[in-house]
Amino acid sequence: IFMSKIKKINSAKIILPSIVLFFTVVLLLSLPVLLNYNSIQNIIEKKVSSEFKINLKILDDISLKIFPRPHYLVKKANIDLNIENDNSSIIETNNLRIFIPYTKIYSKSNITIKEIELENANIYFKIDDVLDFRNHLYYKINKPIHIKNSKFFFLDKNNKTIFISPIKKINYSINKKSNSKELKIKGNIFDIKYD
């Protein structure tokens, strides 16, 4: 009888703090979601420009999502590879994720960006942009950019579409073993699949 009372007391001592700890963690992770992140639009744009060497123009609301990994979700944005040339290629996206560490979910001024992910983007690329893209490959950037389920539009000098290529996935990152940049593309051109 005495042993069964001890087991009941011990299990209550474990279960109750576990429940309190669980709800405390959920509450702490949920609080930043309620804040307004449109005020840090300029900070995010400058940080992306300095760390990824791309021009980001946020066109719609910014929100913070905690799961599955903490990230800022930008509903609509334009991205440009050449910071100095306004006529360079543009990527239009309706779903831009900017991933941040868990330790920075409360920070609005000291933002750390781990990687960027674009989904359902339209990539407009001209023959003149090949040089901009090649130059971008030489920048010392070690944070990955991922593009998923997007369309690549190749344009002529008059901005008329020559062809459209669906892209399943693009991974643009540094291979840490060989210390070189990698560009992995999965999609198809003229019904020919490429990896």
Task: Show which residues each predicted segment covers.
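Short, intrinsically disordered, charge-balanced linker/junction segments flanking boundaries
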Residues: D191-D195
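Flexible beta-edge/linker motif
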Residues: A12, S18, V33-I40, K47, ...
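A short, amphipathic edge element
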Residues: I54-D60
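N-terminal type II signal-anchor transmembrane helix
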Residues: F2-K53
